[in-house]
């Protein structure tokens, strides 16, 4: 499952970047497969480096009328190759060895929406 090593654990990860991650094995309703994820963990932890990272998975199974639980990304945003949704309701921590490679960084307008929606979802 993990092909990571010590070098991979100390890689540079920044909040609101999109990375490819191996989310297998999945359990129940968790998203699995190798897929893009958004790093939502604070850079205070990302700089340590912390051994795990809080992420939101990204899916190509785009849904309508999910303004709070999902944020739609158009093809080309942060170098994504198709339309996608960030699944904010699937926020979770993963071991850094699941992270494979960085794809891109989200624009400020999407970052602002992520912050607002996570505040609503978690009642912060």
Region annotations inferred by a language model:
Residues 30-34, 38-75:
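Compact nucleic-acid interaction/catalytic patches
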Residues 27, 62, 94:
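Feature marks short, surface-exposed loop/turn motifs that line or immediately flank catalytic pockets
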